[in-house]
Amino acid sequence: MDENPEFAAIEQARDLVIDSIAETMDLYGITRSVGILYGTMYMRDEMTLDEMREELQMSKPSMSTGVKKLQDLNVVKKTFHRGIRKHTFVAEKDFFKFFTNFFPPKWEREVQVNVTAIEEAQADLQKVLCKEDLDEDIKNEALQLYDQLESSKAYYDWLKRLAESVQTGEIFKFIPVETK
């Protein structure tokens, strides 16, 4: 039986967007398979794990793991329907909400990891700089590194404030959403 060409064109358009969503998520450290899962859920309404597994031909444990990852990122929600035993899940369809849920935690983690490392490194450098009879070349190298680390703190302060402004929605005062 021949497939309806219009239906095939719709499916091709849907697959094109799913693939681009998966590729974009891969750029930000989310596996391609989880990106395909999100893209598929984005294109559909609520889905059960069985429906996801059937559509994507992946194992149920893989589906569960992928959905859990997307829930942890706060871009997929479990939905409740009285009288239905199977859980259904729905993807966040508003990309602005997706953005405000997805990026700030990553930025906050970057700030936390790097500021902690900088503070530890600067403490170690202070110990080196406090030594008497310190070789001038070593002192200069330690000072140069200390200053470089100190100047990088401005970036992490800015990134922390950016994360906060995205989470609170304040960023949209400066870069408003234009509806088309």
UniProtKB/Swiss-Prot annotation:
MF terms in GO: DNA binding
Q: Gene3D superfamilies annotated for this entry?
A: Winged helix-like DNA-binding domain superfamily/Winged helix DNA-binding domain (1.10.10.10)
Indicate yes or no for the key word Glycoprotein: no
- Supply the name of the protein: HTH-type transcriptional repressor GbsR
User: Which InterPro entries does this chain map to?
Assistant: HTH-GbsR_regulator, MJ1563, WH-like_DNA-bd_sf, WH_DNA-bd_sf
| Source superkingdom | Bacteria
Q: Which SUPFAM superfamilies match?
A: Winged helix' DNA-binding domain (SSF46785)
- DNA-binding region(s), residue ranges: 49-73
NCBIfam families per the UniProt record, alphabetical: choline_R_CudC (NF047500)
Task: Indicate the family of this protein.
Answer: Belongs to the GbsR family.
- Protein task: Negatively regulates the expression of the gbsAB and opuB operons. Required to control expression of these genes in response to choline availability. Also required to down-regulate glycine betaine production once cellular adjustment to high osmolarity has been achieved.
Q: Which organism is it from?
A: Bacillus subtilis (strain 168)
Keywords associated with the record: DNA-binding, Repressor, Transcription, Transcription regulation
Q: How is its activity regulated?
A: Intracellular choline sensor. Binding to choline induces conformational changes and relieves the repressing effects of GbsR on expression.
